[in-house]
Amino acid sequence: MPILQGERMSDSFTSVPIHEAVKCIEWLLGKWKSESSKGQFPTIESFTYEEEATFSHVGQPMLNFSFNSWHHESGKPLHRETGFLRVNPGTNEVAYISAQNFGVVELEEGIVEGTGINLESTTIGRMSFAKDPIVTKVKRTFKLTAPNTLEQTVFMATSKIPEVKEHLWVRYKKIDS
């Protein structure tokens, strides 16, 4: 078996058939760029940001994803997140497994309903020196609202605000399949 490295690795999987288990979420595949966004929470000032989201596969029962966001005006890098969206074969159960650049890892589980996904955190881990407040709960939705339009909404609760509140909303346009 050849050893694959760097870009050759991702290029080599472009013709791999999609795993049967993830056909229910193949509508996510591709590269998406934000066209509208907002961030808010009771403890911060509202803001806008830009983001690119990429969903790909390598023939396994999961999609790989990455989210890269930056400040709307300055272009300064903000949030980075990467992980997997894994489907329990033969079901509509899905798990969202992510690592984030500010020291948080999440496991969210939920269901796929048509062209929508509803998730809720089951485990949130954080590095010992992450700054407060502590995120204690996350709920996330993905919804394909038109053939090339995807929306994501993220709700959260923290050690300071224990009720789940909307934190992020973004509408993406597909820019590459």
List PLM regions with ranges.
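Short hydrophobic/aromatic-rich beta-strand segments that constitute the beta-sheet cores
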Residues: 34, 63-67, 93-98, 117-121, ...
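Amphipathic/hydrophobic helical signal segments and adjacent flexible N-terminal regions
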Residues: 2-62, 66-77, 137, 147, ...
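Acidic, glycine-rich flexible loop segments
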Residues: 103-104, 118-139
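A short secondary-structure junction signal
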Residues: 107-109, 131, 152-155, 164-166
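Helix-adjacent hinge/juxtasegments
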Residues: 72-111
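A short, structured loop/turn motif at beta-sheet edges
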Residues: 55-61, 86-92, 110-117, 143-149, ...
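A structural detector for short beta-strand units
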Residues: 51, 81-83, 106-108, 138-140, ...
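Short, surface-exposed beta-strand-loop junctions and turns on beta-sheet-rich folds
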Residues: 71-72, 102-104, 125-126, 158-159
